[in-house]
UniProtKB/Swiss-Prot annotation:
Function in brief: Plays an essential role in the initiation and regulation of chromosomal replication. ATP-DnaA binds to the origin of replication (oriC) to initiate formation of the DNA replication initiation complex once per cell cycle. Binds the DnaA box (a 9 base pair repeat at the origin) and separates the double-stranded (ds)DNA. Forms a right-handed helical filament on oriC DNA; dsDNA binds to the exterior of the filament while single-stranded (ss)DNA is stabiized in the filament's interior.
Protein name: Chromosomal replication initiator protein DnaA
One Pfam family linked to the record: Bac_DnaA_C
Annotated binding of ATP, by residue: 198, 200-202
Length: 493
């Protein structure tokens, strides 16, 4: 619950019967409709959408604004429009109360009432602590009211739950989680995340914003690309709305700007960013930025901006390693409610190594192709469907490749496989390696025997017969051989 200042508008309004809180929303909504007709769209979104109607009693409407500055700006620039709207909706005797948020700390709220006259001398303040039980009641009342928000521009799918953490992004992930819990009140301000295309920078930044909104820390969260910021800035200058543009950004609590390298060479835009940055940072507002390279490597950015961008934490996101790529694929499949053969997952994770976006693109294409012809998504289907994305050179399959695959599968060493040990897992692995070598290559029995420890051809024949019998007698054994065969095919690509 926040401490508030309440200030009374000097309007002469008619007293009407008391209505419930929901009626306050209807009254304010009607007022907004009239106000919107008389001011431009940017001003309306900036200064009126964040206002919350709190109560309506008699002829008095109480609204909440985010800050003292917010209140003063409305009164200095839009008081005529507000007054006209109130009189049309409520009547000539309407009254307006402003509830101004001045503190978000915990504790018992204190309400201070002042006359709503900007040019008047400050009135004597009367402090009225809430009575026991009123705090919880007031909080419940506020939760029941629809809470207008800034248009955050966040993708609701970009959350921490859909973001895979790995060695490639561990520091950025940890810092982002910390910021989401306490934006602006940490050592990571600004947070700068840099890295190549498609590595998850945008997902990471928007996950912070979505978490802040979900936990109702603040509604004033904005994601914007550097390109859109620059375009809006130019439009604001051309349309004479630069004051409103600047004021809008100075009232953001969590500002997220993507791809700041595009500010390079734009002197006027950098000037505006500089002042916005200073205002937000001094007010402990959170700033989150991304770039395609380290800040110091971006040419055409002013030194004073580079210095400020380095005040907090700058961390990179790298290309995901093999295990992280598998986890990303599995996460995407889980979100889609689909399962895939592990061999297909391994095939994609092995061959798509550049970025997360390509991995997700492979899954989307596979599922789309599957939905069209309802074919089973096996390895061959995956190869055929993804041939335009995954380009690989098929290498000649060697006995060494088979040896590595078998050793990995049975968790044994090459020396074990070629040695004299008769331990069951080693002996079985050796026989399977010989069987697959004969089945998948053109090597002779003699060559196979020599490769696996200098054994003669009769030993190889015995191994072939043994494995063939096991395959015929056991589905489990057949599946084991088939899985190994697929692994070897992937390794040979």
């Amino acid at each position: 619950m926040s401490d508030t200042i309440q200030q009374e508008a000097p309007d002469n309004l008619q007293v009407t019967p008391t209505h419930g809180r929901s009626f306050a929303e209807k009254v304010w909504s009607a007022c907004l409709g009239l106000i919107q007709e008389n001011i431009n769209t940017l001003a309306f979104k900036t200064w009126f959408l964040p206002i919350r109607p709190l109560s309506f009693s008699g002829s008095e409407l109480t609204i909440e604004v985010p800050s003292q500055f917010f209140y003063e700006w409305i009164e200095e620039n839009y008081s005529v429009h507000v007054k006209q709207a109130l009189r049309q909706v409520i009547g000539p005797e309407a009254k307006l109360m402003y509830s101004i948020v001045i503190d978000k700390s915990q504790g018992q709220p204190v309400t201070i009432e002042l006359p709503h006259q900007i040019d008047a001398a400050p009135a004597e303040r009367s402090v009225r602590p809430e009575a026991p039980g009123q705090k919880a009641s007031a909080e419940r009342e506020r939760l029941e009211i629809a809470r207008p928000r800034f248009e955050s521009n966040l993708n609701p799918k970009y959350t921490f739950s859909t973001l895979v953490r790995g060695d490639c992004n561990s520091l950025a992930f940890a810092a982002s989680k910390s910021i989401a819990q306490n934006p602006g009140q940490n050592a990571f301000n600004p947070l700068v995340i840099y890295g190549g295309v498609g590595l998850g920078k945008t997902h990471m930044m928007q996950a912070i914003g979505n978490s802040v909104l979900e936990n109702r820390i603040t509604d004033a969260v904005l994601y914007v690309s550097s390109e859109k910021f620059a375009i809006d800035f130019v439009n604001a200058i051309q349309n004479g709305n630069i004051q409103e543009f600047s004021a809008f950004y100075r009232n953001i609590d969590v500002l997220i700007i993507d791809d700041i390298q595009f500010f390079a060479g734009k002197e006027k835009t950098q000037e505006e960013i500089f002042h916005i940055f200073n205002t937000l940072h001094q007010s402990n507002k959170q700033i989150i930025l991304s770039a395609d390279r380290p800040i110091k490597e971006i040419k055409g950015i002013e030194d004073r901006l580079i210095s400020r961008f380095n005040w907090g934490l700058s961390t990179d996101i790298q290309a995901p390693d093999y295990e992280t790529r598998k986890a990303i694929i599995q996460s995407k499949l889980k979100q889609s409610g689909v399962s895939l053969d592990p061999v297909v997952i391994e095939f994609i994770a092995t061959n798509v190594t550049s970025n997360v976006r390509e991995l997700e693109g492979c899954i989307v294409k596979l599922l789309a192709a599957h939905s069209l012809d309802n074919q089973e998504i096996d390895l061959q289907f995956a190869k055929s469907t993804l041939k335009d994305i995954i380009r690989y050179n098929t290498k000649q399959l060697t006995l060494e490749t088979i040896e590595k695959a078998v050793c990995s599968y049975f968790s044994i060493t090459s020396n074990d496989l070629k040695g004299k040990s008769k331990k069951k897992e080693i002996a079985v692995g050796r026989q399977i390696a010989m069987y697959l070598s004969k089945d998948m290559t053109d090597s002779s029995l003699k060559t196979i025997g020599l490769h696996f420890g200098g054994r003669d051809h009769s030993t190889v024949i015995h191994a072939l017969n043994t494995i063939e019998k096991k395959i015929a007698a056991s589905n489990e054994e057949r599946k084991k051989i088939e899985e190994l065969r697929k692994r070897i095919e992937i390794m040979s690509m």
